[in-house]
């Protein structure tokens, strides 16, 4: 047994040294410096060293002996300090070991690979000590970043995996969905930089089920000493739930880094396909180690992963994804075989051998090696392949869940976050701008982009076509369009957010008076100024919550501009009666089209188009419907107007209207469930009704409906609309009715628990409310305020809203007779004064528009 253990230790040390040498060989000078010095910087704590902070910070790595590079560094620090450093304390030190893991040292490592470092510490560190050690590691991350090296430290309690404790979704160590699988990756890829050897490697695969008992027997026999080994525990049997959760996590990661994640995603799929007889890859590597079979180019973790996935895909006869995973592997290795190398290293030799086995041509290698110059056609093809592969993995995962009757043990919140991000990234929806370049190519910019409009009645579908060519007949005819959409805004947004359209792109447009180059360039400038391309990824909290509009652009009259008919005409209008939604004598709506462009809290980009006289109302209802009542207001709301005439007035009016409606939508509460907003469009008045759960639009045909709508939001009574000859009004009301004005009559009820109200419009049509409950004073104030602010809400030339304030009366009993007296309200006198002031400030002359 002793000789067997010693042989294993020698193999372990040899493979570890091979991995250290390979890691350093693939690094530039800055990476080599950081990688070599991290152990000594965690072992020592000194003001002259990076990572220093005041306090009793845990430091010191068990069994650590500095190598030559580290000794030279210590000598340099002592020379600068002027005195020798204090020797390390004896006994068990706080840090049990420092290990790199992941792609470092494997064939998958390239010169830009980041470093994932596990700092394993003693279980006896208290919370404050762990926090101090975390702060030290954070300072070391900043020190490395100052040299252009990305390092991520992970503090690992030596008992962490025994207690099934995992991190949260916000961290790189995933979430509750991973536990054993995280340990699997560590065991198969760890490189010991300092500290204790990993005990798990010493336990034969056949003893894995009895891991703890076997370890105790080794200690009891004296062949191993407990304080010389890091023991994170055995790889117990994985549950179906854990496979499910971990696979979802890999899909989550694949969205932002597809080539990197495809291989791991398929490894997990292979695990689940073999379930319940799965053998983790780390176990397979350990089996080779114990047998003395140093296969797969020195038990390289990435090569072993490719081999395992290859066997699985061949077994299920999936040649499509096999070809994809080989391309992903090739690109991950970063060795361009079609080009002459400066030197030949082991990675190039291995990759050449694999490519020869795959039968790849030189042309295929040249295409892959030119990835940095891929443009939209090639990138979209690659994106679609990656998407198909991800979705196939997802479908297989769902089948796995059904087959095993899963009750997913992963945190419901984690699962919700994962599925939300998959939905946001992958689901194709009308109006959604699909982002096709998740780290596939660094630059998709085009020198020329041409937008061509095809009207209805032609051979091609009506709408807009996008070409990455200058608009010559030969170029257009001989090329397929990059993208098609019925609406220009969607195409421009797609080109911009996917990086094709930049400040250096030459824009061309061909359309029959819908849009010209000037207007198109204005749109591009507006979008680029208000929508940054790079944003932080949505937080798990945002993904777990309902999506909310964050940045909203309202694009007015891009494709249809009613003001173009004013060209070379004299248009008479009065500023006092100027309403861009019911303009002039014809009460024409000057908004012909509205496009919405918005980005939500899940970082989705969406577009919508509305045209015709009702575009304003439809757009408003849609915007407000996407804002749940408890949502945060958008961070920005911008109106881009491209009208030929009255551009500023139209933009300002829409900005005011949208801002007011958003405020009404987000401020409606259970205590005040109904709010009302009237908008006059093309001579018709419409009401927007703001309820807690929705916003509805209703046409208001006459004054009774209008004022009834207002009062219905303030009074809780039964409303009945009738004609005058269908009801017997109180004689005093009938005799008081006056055409041409709106009249409100309040009448007390016999039980004195409420009141009735009669509303007469200009034509003396009646609406009656019985047994109303509420404040008459509040009703009078709100109705009068709606009317007095009519310049903001209506055209002054409304067919039924005239410039006389509505009249309010109280039906009373005086001297035994029923009489009508004016309703006394301080509100009315103040509103009358405000109106008089408004009138005085308005220009009275007519204006002409040329």
UniProtKB/Swiss-Prot annotation:
Question: How would you summarize its activity regulation?
Answer: The regulatory domain is involved in the regulation of cyclase activity by the carbon source.
Q: Does Iron-sulfur count among this protein's keywords?
A: no
Q: What catalytic reaction does the record list?
A: ATP = 3',5'-cyclic AMP + diphosphate
**Its Gene Ontology molecular function terms?**
adenylate cyclase activity; ATP binding
UniProt-listed GO biological process terms: cAMP biosynthetic process
| Keyword field | ATP-binding, cAMP biosynthesis, Cytoplasm, Lyase, Nucleotide-binding
* Lineage, broadest ranks: Bacteria, Pseudomonadati, Pseudomonadota, Gammaproteobacteria, Enterobacterales
Q: What class of enzyme is it?
A: lyase
| GO cellular component terms attached to this protein's record | cytoplasm
**Cellular location of this protein?**
Cytoplasm
PANTHER family membership? ADENYLATE CYCLASE
* Residue span of region Regulatory: 541-850
| Protein name from the UniProt record | Adenylate cyclase
| Keyword Glycoprotein among record annotations | no
Q: Which parts of this chain are annotated as the region Catalytic? A: 1-535
